[in-house]
Structures are given as structure tokens and as C-alpha cells.
Amino acid sequence: MALRALGRAFPARIGHRSVRGFASSSTEPTLRTALFFPGHGVQRKGMTRDWVEAFPQTCKPFLEEMDDLLQTKLSTLIEEGPIYILDKTENAQPAIMAVSIMILKVLEQEFGFRTEESINVTLGHSLGEYAALVAAGYLTYPFALNLVRQRGEIMGECTRKAKEESGDRFGMMALVCEPDQLDSLVAAVKDFLSHGAEGSKDDSSHSQAIEQVSIANANSKNQIVLSGSFTRIRNLLVHIREFGGHDPRAVELKSNSAFHSPIMQPAYEYMRKVLVPSQVSFPAKMPTISNVTARPFQSKEDLINGLSRQAIDTVLWWDSIKYLDREAGCTRWLGVGPGKVGRNLVSKEVGRSGAKGGGVWSISDPDDIEPTLKGLEQTAHEAAS
């Protein structure tokens, strides 16, 4: 197959690692090619079907291994649904992470894609951080898969308890505004949440976790995501529209839990307990960007702390993209996993599709492979010429 030959011929990376213990280059970009993974909300029924049909030798054993590791037929749930069961946090999150790694395995095993040679840095949006750490070699796939499953069960229980105690719905809502209004919108939100106190959380000691709202994600130059009680979120929107001079477009997200908010404290505590140094390899094959610092993890303890805090802290996605784009010299961006949300967020920020030696690609179904590998090969040659 000509496409497989193209994959095997894929050139080695251009540029050198430059993050603590990695050699740097003064003449070439240091983190030129980024591999990124999607987060919660991209799950859909049947999202493995085309992959199994196109690449049964790789995908069938991979999905069987997933079921064995989790001791449940998650592959059947992904294929057949029902979707309301797949959407449960404890199912959606391991499904998304596993499918993301499966697609990467297809590239490696069917097309000879050499991740360690072709990629300089990995990152993932929220849940996607786990796939990024697996791809870079910090966590093993079996450990990460079970970790995500258990974490998802705890997160689901956190939300159920909050609903029972308050009688309210919990979830996440994106606020979209003009780029030049984002800073003042964030300031207005923070002022409402914490009465001017520094930070994105409502830090009032008199407010229970279920009454709090957090800025869960800073996604782009014109979008943040709020997480928590929908009643409290609606009150916040009324306040900033009446008194803050803002009227952002509000979009409820495909999430039945308030991720990255104080109600997820039990998930943070679980992560701190089970994510021990012996389960983390450091250094690994390449840097991975932390969601909570928007910089590469610097040590085992930094990784353990950052990955644990991710459950309750803001995901600094926009800052991560800006760091790689403006400071680390990243010009090529490869998204791997279900859905196109991650690619759209990256494309909106870096706008590199037409730049010589740069571009943004994503692989979410088999038809994406050929144009992606060709684009990566072409831009590697352009940069070398």
C-alpha cells in the first residue's frame, strides 16, 4: 500500500529537545512538532468501527486488551451504546483515552510512524493529558487506562452527590466573547466568584464546594469555560451582564459533570494517593506540557502534583498553545483522537496551515491519515530546504 510506504518513509524530527536534560540547538526550533490529544466530550457511539474495519490486525487486539485491563466490555459499549451509558464519566474517559492511543498505534504499526523520532512535545486537553503522558513515555498505557477509569468513577460519584445535596444540575458552560474583551470578562467573572480575591476559584470559606463555580478551562483568545452548579453559573451570567458590561455567548457543553471544580476534591485526593513515583518514568522520550502550568513537567513530583491538581484546577490550554507557538518554536501540530474540537482550538490560535514548514492536522478517522502524513512529509522537506 502506497500510504504505508509513505508512513515508513516519514522523516525524523527536525530540531532538538531543550527542556531540562535535553540538548538544545541555536539554529533550529527546539520543540517544532507537537502531538496533542482531545478531552472529554468527543465520545460517540461507533467511534472505533471504521478503525476496526480498516486495520483489524492492530485494532481488534488493542480493544480486546482494553477490555481485559478494565475487566469490562467497554469495546461493546463504544460500538453499540446506548450513548447515555457511554456518556457516563467512568465510561467516556477511558474510552476516549484508549481510542486516542489506538489511533497512534495504527500510525506506528501500520504506517511505520516513529513517534519518538517525529514528535518533539506532547500535550492534551484535560483528559487528553493522560494520552499525552502515555505517548511520551511517562505513564504506561495499562496504568493510565485504569487510573482514568477509577478517576472517572470518583468524578461521577462527586457529581451525583452534589446533585443529591443541592437538587441542582452540574456541568460546564463555555463563554465566548470578542478577543479584546476576554481579559475584562475574566476579571468580571473572578470578581463575582471571589469578590476581587486573586485566583479563578471561589475561595470563600463560607461557601461549600457544591455552591462554587470555577473557571475550568481557558481555551482560546475568546473562550473560557465555567464549571459548577448551573444555578450559580446563571446567576453569574446575570450579574456580569447587568453590572459587568459583558454579554458573552453561553454554550452548555457535552458534560454531565463539573470537571476542574472544587466538587472534584475526592478525585484530587485519589490521584495523590495512587500516582506514586514508582509509576512515573522521568525523564521520558520527550517533554509533555502540564495543563496547570502551561509548561513542561520538570520532575516526577511536578508531574504527580500537576496531574492530580488538574482535577480541580483551571486547564491553561490557551497558555500552553501560546507557549509552544511563541516561545518553543512549534510550527507543526498533529492532533490524534476522536473528534475535531482540539484541532479547531489549535488552528484558531496558531493559524499555521499555510505557513512554509508549518501546519495543523488531525487524525480522527482513517481517511485523515493520507493527507496528514503527506502534509507532515511536505513540511519537513520545506523546512529542510
Each predicted region: which residue ranges?
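Glycine/serine-rich loop-strand microenvironments at binding/catalytic pocket rims
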Residues: M1, L175, P179, N217, ...
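Acyltransferase
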Residues: H246-V336, K340-S347, G351-E370, T379-S385
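A generic secondary-structure signal
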Residues: V106-E110, H239, Y323, E327
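FabD-like malonyl-/acyl-CoA
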Residues: R20-E198, R332-S385
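N-terminal chloroplast transit peptides
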Residues: M1-S18
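A short, flexible low-complexity segment enriched in Lys/Arg and Gly/Pro that occurs
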Residues: R13-G21, A98-M102, Q310-W317
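Alpha/beta catalytic cores of group-transfer enzymes, especially the acyltransferase/condensing modules
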Residues: G41-V42, A136-Q310
